[in-house]
Amino acid sequence: MSEIKVGENETLESALRRFKKKCARAGVLSEVRKREHYEKPSVKKKKKSEAARKRKFK
């Protein structure tokens, strides 16, 4: 889990902004979305191969 230390003269808005940025860099939200529903291994493999195909033809 991402943690930040709030400075003495730091506003809540700026601390929240730093926290959100740190979470985004750590990939927390994307991980939550990915794990929201169970995905069968065959579906994972299919998505992975489709993504590779898209990257190849770009």
From Swiss-Prot:
One of its GO terms (molecular function) is structural constituent of ribosome. GO terms for cellular component: ribonucleoprotein complex; ribosome. Residues 43-58 have a biased composition (Basic residues). It comes from the Bacteria. GO terms for biological process: translation. Keywords: Ribonucleoprotein, Ribosomal protein. Belongs to the bacterial ribosomal protein bS21 family. This is Small ribosomal subunit protein bS21. The gene is rpsU.
